[in-house]
UniProtKB/Swiss-Prot annotation:
Pfam families: Phosducin (PF02114). Belongs to the phosducin family. This is Phosducin-like protein 3. Keywords: Coiled coil, Differentiation, Oxidoreductase, Spermatogenesis. It comes from Drosophila melanogaster. The keyword Oxidoreductase applies. Its EC number is 1.8.1.9. The keyword Coiled coil applies.
Amino acid sequence: MANILENQLFTAAKTIEQQLDQQLDRLDNLDSDDLKVLREQRLREMKDLNNKKQEWLRNGHGTYTELADEKEFFEMSKKSPNIVCHFYRDSTERCKIVDMHLKILAAKHVEAKFCKVNAEKTPFLTQRLRIKVIPTIALVKDSKTKDFIVGFTDLGNCDDFATEMLEWRIAHSGAIDYKGDLMQPPDVKRKPFINRPQKTIRGGYDSDDSDIDLDD
């Protein structure tokens, strides 16, 4: 699975590189009229992006909030195409670490809605997404769960992982716009792993079945 993902990322990177080369070639051959059209196009894109940002902010993006129940989650999934949702439990200390990082990322990535739900108070949603380990972060795009970050295994198996590491991991789902290299994790130093038992809740979790339609 890791090799497949690596090959896919490599292919995507090569495609992007080729597209950039083609764009640079076109820029070299532009005249004044072409440059004017390009500037006008860029202005329209900036205006569209600003309108999107305003809509995102009206829908609660930019802040990390708690959802009261399943109904609020499903309502939000209709308004926000990108969702980063932390399933937590009050008794799990590691959830506080996740809260700290997601609060930072929520302000940085307004294109996604960052939120959390209490797994014990949302049994229907927790079982539907087959959440078993706490903390788990569900990554939703266009009303479909694309990926899950289960515990801290993907974050270096340490409690003091960098926010950039979590950002990089979230970006693999496409739920946020990421400017870095998806093929290379951030170069951060970590302390030795503190082995703590992961909290589990009833129900199963299957990481291979990650494309669950929330509209059903």
